[in-house]
Amino acid sequence: MKKIIYTIAFVFLLANTSCQKNQEARKPIANSSGSFMKQSVDRNKKLIAGEEAEIARVIRQNKRVKFIASTKGFWYSYIATNTKDTLTPKKGDVALFDYEVKDLKGRIIYSQSELGPQTYFVDKQNIMMGLRDGIKLMHRNEKINFLFTSAITYGYHGDNKKIGTNKPLLCIVTLRDFMSEANYDQKMKANSTSDSTTQNDSIIN
């Protein structure tokens, strides 16, 4: 009977020791993962700080231009203002705008003619995060310079075309018009009907 008790106790001791070793073996993995996350966060903080320093330098170099710091993490200045209107685009509207994209040295990456007129269903389409928030500040016919960090443009991946990794950008945006989706649909139907009538007239003539 004593032998059985000793055997059971020995097996239990081995099992307990094995569990402790397994737990100890897993700890470095958790520590390693936590360390990696901390390093990643630190790198991102340094990256953002560096880009914000670049933007601050641009603002200092343009002392005559009044830049405003937004609550969304970007800076902007007015080229053309509209003080008569109070409405701005909101979710459920369609914004019609033009824009061009430059680097912080003012070199054109995408020209307005290259990008063409833009039609944006507010907060329902996947566009640059900075633009998404910036457009909602604008009144009709306003033109604004936006300074964006890469975190709210194309980030680490760029756009896989002309914009590389972690590039802060200057975007110059003109809001031509905006309207509700219902009004936009009506306008598109009216244009479609008008085009169809013109084609029929040309065929008859």
Positions of PLM-derived features:
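Cross-family detector of peptidyl-prolyl cis-trans isomerase
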Residues: 19-205
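Sec-dependent bacterial lipoprotein signal peptides
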Residues: 1-19
